[in-house]
Amino acid sequence: MIDRRDENTFKLVSKYQPSGDQPQAIEQLVDNIEGGEKAQILLGATGTGKTYTMSQVISKVNKPTLVIAHNKTLAGQLYGEFKEFFPENAVEYFVSYYDYYQPEAYVPSSDTYIEKDSSVNDEIDKLRHSATSSLLERNDVIVVASVSCIYGLGSPKEYADSAVSLRPGQEISRDQLLNQLVDIQFERNDFDFQRGRFRVRGDVVEVFPASRDEHAFRIEFFGDEIDRIREIESLTGKILGEAEHLVLFPATHFVTNDEHMEASIAKIQAELASQLKVFESEGKLLEAQRLKQRTEYDIEMLREMGYTNGVENYSRHMDGRSEGEPPYTLLDFFPEDFLIMIDESHMTMGQIKGMYNGDQARKKMLVDYGFRLPSALDNRPLRREEFESHVHQIVYVSATPGDYELEQTDTIVEQIIRPTGLLDPIVEVRPTMGQMDDLLGEINLRTERGERTFITTLTKKMAEDLTDYLKEMGVKVKYMHSDIKTLERTEIIRDLRLGVFDVLIGINLLREGIDVPEVSLVAILDADKEGFLRNERGLIQTIGRAARNSQGRVIMYADKMTESMQKAIDETARRRQIQMAYNEEHGIVPQTIKKEIRDLISITKGTNTEVEEESLDYSVMTKSERQEAIKKLQKQMHEAAELLDFELAAQIRDMVLELKSMD
């Protein structure tokens, strides 16, 4: 394991004190961790402040912590919240750095080879480097990650051993430093100074670390000795301070030294020779020629540049791993005694399980048709059992824990009471006969009170028919289907909150970002049709959409009571009873959550100024107008990222991608 040089402790900063059943949940979780419990579940109802509880636990157990979410948006939200709770500690963000990613693939039926195509988000790449360097330098680290954290990354030992350590007074010549920087994949560019680059002016070398975005370092030499190291603003060169010690980690996570490189190339060549014999014996001459040409080109690039596109496909040889051995991942950068928290574990653990099979199916096709060596199969995500082998202690966090989590542990810590006093909604079951008229009456009641309604159906046709019917009846209604893009989806939710329309119909309204405090009625059609969206967990998640309004109510339309319905109704009633008893004992009156309705493209700064993009019809713009709009949006995206509002930055990014696709 890598020795951390820093023993900092976590310091939680919050104007809140634990309330409701947060204190007992925090105490139980901490006691279980300190008592050596390997796995436990935090069963937290929607809106009970699970992130705050997680933060309290982290600050008390004081271990490096990995928090895994099931998508970038949720990871971004959690990252922002943890940054606020721990301003003095290292809170890092580690997700896939691809804005756009088309993996390398081959389709035999049409003889189509699809080359890997991607667009790397520079900001996220910086944050990934920041995460790995923090993990090697200190202990007070929280990394919020997507399942990207189980994908192959370079060896942490190579990454750490390759780091360049510099101090004032150190004997090293300027040229020695330049050679070391090139070895760890820094690029010399005296004119365009960006992350992962350095520039030289006489006896002064300026280096821009891969983990920074505004600050660089100026290393001043006196002969063959470092005279001083200064931190500077990368753009202006303004001096920000003196540094007593500077550690420069490699500019890429896949790095190896010259000695290892030659050994790796020898292994690649041996595997190539072996695979060529296999193809030739099978009469696959085209595949053999293809593989020979591609691999020899990559070897030449590795020899000359120390890097090649797709270098990760040779990671087994670079890392010195055996066939089938799991790759290094972000988890290997953590010390042995670290804590894992899985947010929305009922979704995330399913993702962790499924990543390996999909990756192998695609790569096997590339190997079979001579596009990659068989060792490329070992550049892969971890299998679930390999992930489990990294687990020292883990907390699964969910309102509806999955079967997997429940099999792993009997230790369940409940957090049912909301700080706002809000109760789980009342759930009714009504017959399907006459359901349209009944539903219309319920909608009108809510509309008169200025409240909103969610309706969830099972089929696209039913959603469309219901939308048409309600429109004929004078209801302001919209249907949100799967073809709607991220940005438009956010606009729809905002319009619902503003009252542009009163009813939203969808098939799956469980997705993140769909919590709307104005919604007081959730109607579930075909509630008795068992399946993914009508199982116990799906129903509890849907019921939770009405839990942010003091008038919250759920109506299930069904002709029979299924086991899933009964379990969901019983669990909701159980939670509601606990919440009512607590409110009565403490004299709390439930209050609907007050949540600001934010403009779609607005970033509020400390000065309360706003950057806004008017709502325009981009389809009628000229190409030059679209290019101008893209520039404006990219500026706003970077401003959002600087303010750590990654949810908004992601929305703007999606809008930019939509605009680019029009050209």
Curated annotation (Swiss-Prot):
One of its GO terms (biological process) is SOS response. Keywords: ATP-binding, Cytoplasm, DNA damage, DNA excision, DNA repair, Excision nuclease, Helicase, Hydrolase, Nucleotide-binding, SOS response. GO terms for molecular function: ATP binding; ATP hydrolysis activity; DNA binding; excinuclease ABC activity; helicase activity. ATP binds at G44, A45, T46, G47, T48, G49, K50, T51. Residues 31-271 form the Helicase ATP-binding domain. Its main location: cytoplasm. It is found in: Cytoplasm. A motif (Beta-hairpin) lies at residues 97-120. GO terms for cellular component: cytoplasm; excinuclease repair complex. It comes from the Bacteria. Residues 435-601 form the Helicase C-terminal domain. Forms a heterotetramer with UvrA during the search for lesions. Interacts with UvrC in an incision complex. The beta-hairpin motif is involved in DNA binding. Belongs to the UvrB family. HAMAP family: UvrB (MF_00204). This is UvrABC system protein B. It comes from Streptococcus uberis (strain ATCC BAA-854 / 0140J). The lineage of its organism: Bacteria, Bacillati, Bacillota, Bacilli, Lactobacillales.
